[in-house]
Every structure is written in structure tokens, then in C-alpha cells.
Amino acid sequence: MPKMKTHKGAAGRFEVMKRGKLRRRRAGHNHILEKKTSKRKRRLNTETYVNPADEKRVRRLLGVR
């Protein structure tokens, strides 16, 4: 059976932490920022974790257990 390939798009977006959690950035903080409030931009700037319902799919893309 051939090796599993890492999905490079997912590899750039997610990071596996030491405890096994998957970290991601929040969407909506790249452009069109002028109309967004400072409070909203601060909130969007923080990192968060992948929802447990999506973890299995993301792990498969990354090729990690």
C-alpha cells in the first residue's frame, strides 16, 4: 500500500500541539479590515482549536493520529 500524502493546504493551516490538539487561526482577519471594529479584529487575531467534530477529518488530511 502506498504512503499517505500530507494535504499541503491543510498542513499550512493547522498545527498539532504537544497534547495532540489541533490549533488553527480564525477566519476573516486577512483583508477588508477597515470596517471591522478593533474589538472584533483583536478577537479574530487569537488562535483557537479545531472543533472535536472536525478533528478526525483534519487529522486524516495531515496524516497524523
Curated annotation (Swiss-Prot):
Keyword Ribonucleoprotein carried by entry = yes
Quote any Pfam family the record assigns.
Ribosomal_L35p
GO molecular-function terms, A-Z: structural constituent of ribosome
- The reply on keyword Disulfide bond is no
- GO cellular-component terms in the record? cytosolic large ribosomal subunit
Q: What InterPro entries does its record include?
A: Ribosomal_bL35, Ribosomal_bL35-like, Ribosomal_bL35_sf
Stretches of the chain forming a coiled coil according to its record: none
Record-linked Gene3D superfamilies? 4.10.410.60
Say which family it is in: Belongs to the bacterial ribosomal protein bL35 family.
- This protein is called what? Large ribosomal subunit protein bL35
Species of origin reads Rubrobacter xylanophilus (strain DSM 9941 / JCM 11954 / NBRC 16129 / PRD-1)
